[in-house]
Structures are given as structure tokens and as C-alpha cells.
Amino acid sequence: MSKAYEQSGVNIHAGYEAVERMSSHVKRTMRKEVIGGLGGFGATFDLSQLNMTAPVLVSGTDGVGTKLKLAIDYGKHDSIGIDAVAMCVNDILTTGAEPLYFLDYIATNKVVPEVIEQIVKGISDACVETNTALIGGETAEMGEMYHEGEYDVAGFAVGAVEKDDYVDGSEVKEGQVVIGLASSGIHSNGYSLVRKLINESDIDLASNFDNRPFIDVFLEPTKLYVKPVLALKKEVSIKAMNHITGGGFYENIPRALPAGYAARIDTTSFPTPKIFDWLQQQGNIDTNEMYNIFNMGIGYTVIVDEKDVSRALKILAEQNVEAYQIGHIVKNESTAIELLGV
């Protein structure tokens, strides 16, 4: 590479070191179907080895949002990689798809190999947990686009599901039950408001909250639901699923419901993590609005027939997932969600 390019602000050698540092982490994620991985112009994946009759590919992309600012300010970068994967694979999981592979995009002011390695380690940890191959990525050094120390992370996930097993909500009916899977905390949404409230409160993020440092609570990575939900799908007919992200209950649960139906949710049927109480009190936020911003303790929902509820809860418990019967489906022409207890 020419000296002129390096003089323009791009550190080629730092990029090489970052690639070398991340390689061992990436190798941990490989699946037998991967033909070509990092290093080529395009990564390849052999769908014929999936033993599916009529595979449907499902793709999704997402970022981590301004949660990144907290991670950057406090030098904790590995959990952000987990968030990047979780936001993507949890989304495509709602169709019943098994995640197959993942690609990342990291853009930064200046490549710091140690930081890039931490991010990719987190990505790889999440990929290993969800059996998702990290088969490609891009690290872009753009000094004029970002302030010193800043970076952004985005992810891209592709999965597959048998055409006959595709979950689209079309089988949702009155009387079916909504099961909520517990979140790990705030996950990766609402952080513009979270950061505003942190700044207004003037709290010491190193101080303890609920027996943990505040910063650890705020940076707790998004929960990965792939393993427990796929295990559930093998045993129980799932009618619809939702990943509770930006917009909370109000914007996400209706996305999987046919017209004319609503999910009637009892907000007293599951515990709300204490951090949401802190946020609500700090911002003097109406309870109804909280459910329109945050996951409030439920990060993912599945809808099943009433006869399958006990079995579903048992399977999820065996997968070490806290789950609750949080509501049921009713006929409603005017709204797609009814929240009780707010």
C-alpha cells in the first residue's frame, strides 16, 4: 500500500493486526456448510447440506444504536458484539428460521486492533452460542466521519426455514396464549433516552444498583433466544413470534397478528426488572409510555394453542429460560394490543 494512502489517515498495518487478532475468534464459529470464509471477495455457504426440502432464506440487518456511546465511554466493547448478533438473529428467528451465517460492519475513526478484537470476540461468542457462522465482515477506517475513539457496528444475518414450517402469524386465532420470554434487561433499544436520564441524574456508573455496578446493568447484552425457541419449535406448534425491540410492546406485538385480532397482555403476570423502575422514576415517564419504549422485562414472545402452554413452559424451563403466560388472543377490530394493569 502506498505511503500516500497512509498519510491520508488510513493505518494499513493496524488493519492487518486487527484481522490477525480476530481470526482465532472467527474460526470458532465455523459450520460444515461454509465453503469460503474471511479473506475472499465473497463468503459462500452450501445450502444443500442443510437437508431441507424447500428452504426459504430469511435475512435481517440491524445495529446497536446509541448503546455504543456507553460502551465507548467505559471501554467495554465485547458485549456490544453480542448485541449486534442478537438484534439480527432474534429478528429472523421470529419466522422460525435457523440462523446460518452472519456478517459484520465496523466503521471507526481509527482502527485500534485491541478494540476491534474485543468487538469481534463478542460477535463470535454470540455466533457460537447460536450456531451461526461468522463468514464475512468489513472494518472501515474513516477518520473524517467519526470523532476519535468512536465507532459504529452493524450486523447482517441470514437463516433458513422449511417453507412448510414458516411462521407468519396467519394461524393466530382467538383463545391462543401469549408466552413471554424474559429479557436480560434493557437490551439495545431506547438508549438515547437512557443516556439522557443518566446524564440528568448525575449518577456514578461505577456505583452499585441491585448488587451490580450501574454500567454493567446498562451494558448487559441482549439475550439470545435462538436455542430455546428452536428447541420449542421442534415440540410445539408456534403460531406467531415477536422480538420486543424499539417501540416496546405497542409496536412489536401487533406485527405478527392478523387483522381483527389483538393480544390482551396482563402486565402483572411477569416481573419488571428494577432498572425500568429507576428509568421511569428518573424521567417521570407514564407507565403506558414505558411499554411503548422498552421491553419491560419481556424480550421475546411466542403464541401457542392453549393446550400447548404447559408443555411450552416446561420446554423453555429446561432450556434455562424464564417464561410466563402473559396474555391471550382476542378479537378486536380497533386495536392490535390491549395492555391490562397500566
Swiss-Prot record:
<dbReference type="InterPro" id="IPR010918">
    <property type="entry name" value="PurM-like_C_dom"/>
</dbReference>
<dbReference type="InterPro" id="IPR016188">
    <property type="entry name" value="PurM-like_N"/>
</dbReference>
<keyword id="KW-0436">Ligase</keyword>
<keyword id="KW-0963">Cytoplasm</keyword>
<keyword id="KW-0658">Purine biosynthesis</keyword>
<dbReference type="Pfam" id="PF02769">
    <property type="entry name" value="AIRS_C"/>
</dbReference>
<dbReference type="GO" id="GO:0006189">
    <property type="term" value="P:'de novo' IMP biosynthetic process"/>
</dbReference>
<comment type="pathway">
    <text>Purine metabolism; IMP biosynthesis via de novo pathway; 5-amino-1-(5-phospho-D-ribosyl)imidazole from N(2)-formyl-N(1)-(5-phospho-D-ribosyl)glycinamide: step 2/2.</text>
</comment>
<dbReference type="GO" id="GO:0005829">
    <property type="term" value="C:cytosol"/>
</dbReference>
<comment type="similarity">
    <text>Belongs to the AIR synthase family.</text>
</comment>
<dbReference type="InterPro" id="IPR004733">
    <property type="entry name" value="PurM_cligase"/>
</dbReference>
<keyword id="KW-0067">ATP-binding</keyword>
<dbReference type="GO" id="GO:0005524">
    <property type="term" value="F:ATP binding"/>
</dbReference>
<dbReference type="GO" id="GO:0004641">
    <property type="term" value="F:phosphoribosylformylglycinamidine cyclo-ligase activity"/>
</dbReference>
<keyword id="KW-0547">Nucleotide-binding</keyword>
<dbReference type="InterPro" id="IPR036676">
    <property type="entry name" value="PurM-like_C_sf"/>
</dbReference>
<dbReference type="GO" id="GO:0004637">
    <property type="term" value="F:phosphoribosylamine-glycine ligase activity"/>
</dbReference>
<protein>
    <recommendedName>
        <fullName>Phosphoribosylformylglycinamidine cyclo-ligase</fullName>
        <ecNumber>6.3.3.1</ecNumber>
    </recommendedName>
</protein>
<dbReference type="GO" id="GO:0046084">
    <property type="term" value="P:adenine biosynthetic process"/>
</dbReference>
<dbReference type="InterPro" id="IPR036921">
    <property type="entry name" value="PurM-like_N_sf"/>
</dbReference>
<dbReference type="Pfam" id="PF00586">
    <property type="entry name" value="AIRS"/>
</dbReference>
